[in-house]
Swiss-Prot record:
Reported consequences of knocking out the gene: Disruption of the gene results in a complete loss of DTDB degradation. Mutant cannot grow with DTDB as the sole carbon source.
Catalytic activity from the UniProt record: 2 4-sulfanylbutanoate + NAD(+) = 4,4'-disulfanyldibutanoate + NADH + H(+)
Coiled coil: none
Family named by the database record: Belongs to the NADH:flavin oxidoreductase/NADH oxidase family.
Function as written in the Swiss-Prot or TrEMBL entry: Involved in the degradation of the organic disulfide 4,4'-dithiodibutyric acid (DTDB). Catalyzes the initial cleavage of DTDB into 2 molecules of 4-mercaptobutyric acid (4MB). Low activities are observed with other disulfide compounds, such as 3,3'-dithiodipropionic acid DTDP, 3,3'-thiodipropionic acid TDP and DTNB.
Database matches in InterPro entries: Aldolase_TIM, NADH_flavin_oxidoreductase, OxRdtase_FMN_N
Temperature-activity profile: Optimum temperature is 45 degrees Celsius.
Enzyme nomenclature, EC number: 1.8.1.20
Native source organism of the sequence: Rhodococcus erythropolis (Arthrobacter picolinophilus)
UniProt note on regulation of activity: Inactivated by cobalt, nickel and zinc ions.
Gene Ontology MF annotations: FMN binding; oxidoreductase activity
Name by which UniProt lists this protein: 4,4'-dithiodibutanoate disulfide reductase
Active-site residues, record numbering mapped to chain: Y173 (proton donor)
Residues that hold FMN according to the record: Q103, A348, R349
């Protein structure tokens, strides 16, 4: 019996109907440059720069399927009004030889009810910190409406020229919360057993697949673990992933974990930029963060490729293409992932630190990125997501450039 050779990082690879120029994609990271949800030149330039830097595909982060599905008021709602700007974005990415993906979702319990001025949707009645009060479980009619929103949004993404659509099934946003035994206490067709808790995400994915057609890839960002007590863990997430695979509507699954609602550091790892978070918030919120921040943001030591131990179990159980995510900063990590059977890797912070990193990997001028996992990029989502270390170097170099 012969073993198939490990694919090269820089050979073209298939993702559903698409051919990607290499095995590295830019993971969705909220860009923070969409004032009142508008497509801006900064957003377009952000993704064009990533594409120019060599990534095979760049993902526009968190496009809400409705105003109520926004994380806050500066979240893009992907509807017909956004089409002209989104077409400019996909054209800019394509001009650099890369493909463009749109991450679409509904924030659910993570939504900011006050700025959205809409009702928060959740699987079940519970207290919600972002809503600052009790949130009632969504009705069947409301959930039907969200399915229609996903379907419409997928059509807009296709019209805008996106090559792939990533459905957000992670971090305890709406679809992820339906999978979670901690958040889903329903007693109807969408709650109870593992199979029933998978039913609503299945319905949404099918609607997106039908709307997207056969020439656009459909993927899911999927929670392997919520990282919280009584939440979703591998004993239940693996069977759900197998159900989604059997449905046949997904071209790939990007594996993640954690909860934006209850445990945000789980999918970052490394240093907690608490002082920077406090400074980025209004005074009252900042005071609260100062005292309760250590509980809200527990510390997890950073390890290169930190989701690999969990993801390895998914690789063994599934046949569909898988995208490895989580602290990938080195060439040898990527090679190891491909050797273990992952079709692609997704990078985020490393490309914030150096958008040219993929080109440098290919030229063999470096074998690892410069990200130090200080996570000080996290609080910049309110003013334009960026690497503050990179910013400081640019400022420091400016006088030399003027000499």
């Amino acid at each position: 019996m012969t073993t198939a050779p490990t694919p090269s990082i820089f050979e073209p690879a298939r993702l559903g109907p698409l051919t990607l120029r290499n095995r590295i994609v830019k993971a969705a990271t909220f860009e923070g440059v969409m004032p009142r949800g508008a497509v801006s030149d900064d957003l377009i330039n952000f993704h064009a720069e990533v594409a120019r830097g060599g990534a095979a595909m760049t993902t526009v982060a968190y496009c809400a399927v409705s105003p109520g599905g926004r994380v806050h008021r500066d979240t893009l709602v992907m509807d017909e009004r956004a089409l002209p700007g989104l077409r400019r974005l996909t054209d800019a990415v394509h001009a650099e030889g890369a493909l463009a993906a749109a991450q679409i979702g509904h924030a659910g319990l993570v939504a900011n009810t006050l700025s959205n001025k809409t009702k928060t949707l959740a699987p079940s009645t519970r207290l919600s910190p972002p809503a600052m009060g009790l949130v009632k479980g969504a009705t069947l009619a409301e959930l039907d409406g969200v399915v229609s929103d996903f379907e419409r949004t997928a059509r807009v993404a296709v019209d805008a020229g996106f090559d792939a659509i990533e459905v957000h099934l992670g971090h305890n946003y709406l679809l992820s919360s339906f999978m979670s035994p901690n958040l889903n206490k329903r007693h109807d067709r969408y709650g109870g057993s593992v199979a029933k808790r998978a039913e609503y995400p299945r319905r949404v994915i099918e609607a997106v697949r039908v709307a997207a057609g056969s020439s656009v890839a459909v993927t899911a960002k999927f929670n392997m673990s919520d990282g919280v007590p009584k939440g979703l863990w591998l004993d239940q997430s693996l069977p759900i992933a197998q159900i989604l695979e059997a449905d046949g509507h997904l071209d790939a699954m990007q594996l993640t974990g954690g909860s934006s609602l209850l445990n945000g550091m789980y999918f970052f790892r490394g240093e907690v930029p608490l002082a920077e978070f406090v400074a980025s918030q209004p005074k009252l919120v900042g005071y609260g963060l100062k005292f309760y921040g250590p509980k809200i943001f527990p510390t997890y030591p950073f390890e290169e490729g930190f989701f690999l131990p969990f993801a390895r179990q998914f690789r063994q159980a599934l046949r569909m293409p898988l995208i490895l995510l989580g602290g990938i900063n080195r060439v040898d990590t990527i090679e190891h992932a491909l050797d273990e059977g992952f079709e692609f890797v997704a990078m985020a912070r490393a490309l914030l630190r150096d958008p040219q990193l993929v080109n440098k990997f290919q030229a063999e001028s470096v074998d690892q990125g410069l990200c130090i996992h200080c996570n000080k990029c996290m609080p910049t989502i309110y003013t334009g997501t960026r690497c503050v270390v990179r910013d400081a170097l640019v400022v420091r170099e400016a006088p030399r450039l003027g000499q």
